[in-house]
Amino acid sequence: MIDVNNFEYMKIGLASPDKIRSWSYGEVKKPETINYRTLKPEKDGLFCERIFGPQKDWECHCGKYKRVRYKGVVCDRCGVEVTRAKVRRERMGHIELAAPVSHIWYFKGIPSRMGLVLDMSPRALEEVIYFASYVVTESGDTPLDKKQLLSEKEYRAYRDRYGSTFQAAMGAEAIKKLLQDIDLDKEVDFLKEELKTAQGQRRTRAIKRLEVLEAFRNSGNEPSWMILDVLPVIPPELRPMVQLDGGRFATSDLNDLYRRVINRNNRLKRLLDLGAPSIIVQNEKRMLQEAVDALIDNGRRGRPVTGPGNRPLKSLSHMLKGKQGRFRQNLLGKRVDYSGRSVIVVGPNLKMYQCGLPKEMALELFKPFVMKELVEKGLAHNIKSAKRKIERVQPEVWDVLESVIKEHPVLLNRAPTLHRLGIQAFEPTLVEGRAIRLHPLVCTAYNADFDGDQMAVHVPLSSEAQAEARLLMLAAQNILNPKDGKPVVTPSQDMVLGNYYLTLEREGAIGEGMVFKDANEALLAYQNGYVHLHTRVAVAASAVNNATFTEEQKSMLLLTTVGKLIFNEILPESFPYINEPTNSNLEKETPAKYFVEKGANIKEIIASREEVAPFSKKILGNIIAEVFKRFKITETSRMLDRMKNLGFKYSTKAGITVGVSDILVLGEKDEILHEAQAKVDNVIKQFRRGLITEEERYDRVISIWSNAKDVIQGKLMKSLNKRNPIFMMSDSGARGNASNFTQLAGMRGLMANPSGRIIELPIKSSFREGLTVLEYFISTHGARKGLADTALKTADSGYLTRRLVDVAQDVIVREDDCGTDRGLLIGAIKEGNEVIESLYDRLVGRFARKTVKHPETGEVLVAENQLITEDIAHIVENSGVETVNIRSAFTCNTRHGVCKKCYGRNLATGTDVEVGEAVGIIAAQSIGEPGTQLTMRTFHTGGVAGDDITQGLPRIQEIFEARNPKGQAVISEIDGVIAAINDVKDRQEVVVQGEVETRTYAIPYGARLKVIPGQQISHGKELTEGSIDPKELLKVTDITAVQEYLLREVQKVYRMQGVEIGDKHVEVMVRQMLRKVRVSDAGETDVLPGTLLDIHQFTDANAKVLLQGKQPATARPVLLGITKASLETDSFLSAASFQETTRVLTDAAIKGKRDELLGLKENVIIGKLVPAGTGMNRYRKVDLVKTTQDDMNVENDEVYVEQ
């Protein structure tokens, strides 16, 4: 038996009239829907039961046959087959049209496919189809040309003159005749000949025509099928009619549109039977044509047909398009059963992998499992009584529920799901109340807080789904962020504050210099008030359980504080004892200066030493990363839970509060402001004398005030007491920063107006002093702009993510090694002298392409194809090596994806990437998710051209859409020397002298030069400040230069905003933008000049002709923006579900495209498992068996794969 869901590819094409009739179960002859008295469908109408099947299961129209035993019987009285009512979702009907009509997609699309096939203009076609002109279909022996248009008057004149020696007609019938007469092979040969000589517009037109004609020739579609003789009627359940409360009916718009077609069709039939005058018949045919147009795509031509209240009716095309269309609403996003949502509250007592599920919700979600268990335990006799027990909530139900949810993970999701950490799995524990409890450490990943956020719960049902949830999605498994490989579960707010307070040191605290034999004794002393948490004490090192101490150190005393003793208890034994927040202490061992000989004067030694800084949020993050690197995930998650508990406990003990008295106003503030004001007055004086321009005055005033603010900030931070609660909050990284503090206690400073230009009047007051009315008014400008920006940014960033996902969704790790011999030469990314991304960051987790040797000693640091770990990267960076050749996604040879070696390490797990990992989607999420943190601003620094470069989110969109950038730089097309810079008519010209030729570049007005005479310049380098247009760069240089430029630019934007993203994510996206080439000369291949081809398709076509010793084709690489690249993908399902649905489908149907179902979207649409992860063929054969608790040993969580 064939499996309906198991097919290799999906093909789309034009349907012939016979094909449409073969789909149909009967002809719809009447426009009636249902009888309003009996509420039964009318016979032969749009809801007819004889055509589409019965309305009720196993029951015919007249009621003669009822019950399932008559299955398959066709009633002799009403002709309805007795079957399930579900067939009304799949059975189609048809309408036999009295006159052929054209299909609006093929006639009206851009370019008009019908027009290209017939070589007629769309305007001429329109005149013929809508009965305004005649077209000559057979010229006979008259001087008329075939396809010539004739007006009514001309037609009459020629008829009188030549009689019936020629034929001309109107409407779709005429076009159909012309389409049937076309000899595709002859036309194609003729066009190929023409291409050899044609130039300009004629050449472009010929290429377009050739593409469409070749498509028809190769796909087996007949051009005449673009004209409809038969109209399919979609199943009635897809255009339902429902009764409302008041007895009125609500119906789908399609029924109205079908009704108009049937009415006009029947009237036309009657007129033809009566032999009505041709003018009336023509008018009726035109109306039929318009009715069919409205049904297929309402509003595409002329005014749309409207329903009640002047609302345009939704046609078949509208059912597919847009967010509410079939693709995005029903095929790509379905609502699921076994789900619930509720408000979240914090669950500080949960373990990392747990969540609290409200009892009533759990009972409803796990209902089938509970019912099964009730029957198995004999607590209920059958399923029905089990169901009744649950609905009445009888006490025994709760015990069963407890046992059912053990070992059964649930998925929690918070919208918006910006990256894969927006859905994670947890083990549920039952809680009272109606709120979901969430572990505080996973909030960062979800971006959740407890001010009323809601979350959704989903239950994985099959054992495979449960296994995947447990092994891959459990919150304790997702400790690292896929975008940069740094821990995402770092403590925040209270937890940070507690650990910060715990590790503080204070000079002269109670009991300073006491010596204890072990940690317990120190704790005892603390609990009895002899020492404080912050007291610096000594403990016998041998009693501190730590594997990194040497034998010598164990015989000494360790100087530390009571708080640090408590803090170090949470770390694994073999981890260094952390006494100071430095990397050397974290990675290697405790510094020797903290060990003293027994018998030394401890008090003196302690008194002579500085206080050691406490552990801030950043240090805690580093500790987590280090523990993760050395130990298993389980160990890390245990440590995180202990860190969380410590944090909450000691932030409670600390009792840190904020009061107005904690905000101390700086005494020297007035002095600083006076000085600044004097400088500003001086600048204004110079301006009035005409010594400086308006621009300069503005810039100087701005810089004076920002300097004043910086001075105040510096002095404030110095004058602050280290015990000040606000300082502790910002220093620990719990909340707030230095700038917030300056605004509270110093001055608010300069504000921007709504256009983003800085207002030169600063706000001199601080919040502690209070703002004047004018100052308050100025500050509202910036605040309002901030709120408006945030709202816009969220939508923009979401749309960016959607486009990124779409372009990269089929990039999957497909093989272990593609065997490429190319690599990418990388160094640190710099902007001026500032390093934006260091070489170390770019090397970690990549494979070396070529051996790296020490520049001085020549020893091999990294071998070819070796993974560069953190340690190796440090060694390479410190050796003074500037550039390293690595394997990169840019140079990967794998088709439809990348290989393991070129991708490198999976950032989310810190291990090698697995075959089947959907790295394209991960890349898209990693770039899109921080999008909301980028600013919307185009910074206006007083409008100096070249300075107004776009930054933030708009710049990222500019890069990925490959648009011409704002403030575009002029680039040199040749290597050479800057020979001269001349002034020509208030502009400048730069002359670049190369070895062979000299080029002169006109510099746009107001652009700032980047070069000086005599300077060496290479091709593709900027002559002026600004952003390079990557398309220009591609013309001048090669693909590699463009790839590196785009990568560098994206990293610049994100790093400037303090967001770190792994290079490999950007590489995957940029690679997708450069996948296509445009054929410039076809050689002796089958490809058409001017067409876009995938690089692999192009090389295949060339390989084929080269083997036969023929002339290969040539092509140029093309840079496509992500939207364009998504629409150019090979998969028509993916493209149609993205944007421009009708255009994509029209094109695909004519070409008879096959979708090979390689990407993820295509498979989601047709309901197959996605071909990534465990859905890949190589993993499909695995059988999962649910085991008991004893077998489930956490260490052995490998799943064995049988090939």
Curated annotation (Swiss-Prot):
Cofactor notes = Binds 1 Mg(2+) ion per subunit.
Do you know which Pfam families this protein is assigned to?
Answer: RNA_pol_Rpb1_1 (PF04997), RNA_pol_Rpb1_2 (PF00623), RNA_pol_Rpb1_3 (PF04983), RNA_pol_Rpb1_4 (PF05000), RNA_pol_Rpb1_5 (PF04998)
Q: Which CDD domains match?
A: RNAP_beta'_C, RNAP_beta'_N
* Keywords noted in UniProt: DNA-directed RNA polymerase, Magnesium, Metal-binding, Nucleotidyltransferase, Transcription, Transferase, Zinc
Matching entries from InterPro entries are given as: DNA-dir_RpoC_beta_prime, DNA-dir_RpoC_beta_prime_bact, RNA_pol_asu, RNA_pol_N, RNA_pol_Rpb1_1, RNA_pol_Rpb1_3, RNA_pol_Rpb1_3_sf, RNA_pol_Rpb1_4
Record's function text: DNA-dependent RNA polymerase catalyzes the transcription of DNA into RNA using the four ribonucleoside triphosphates as substrates.
What is the protein named? DNA-directed RNA polymerase subunit beta'
Q: Which organism is it from?
A: Bacillus cereus (strain ATCC 10987 / NRS 248)
Q: Coding gene?
A: rpoC
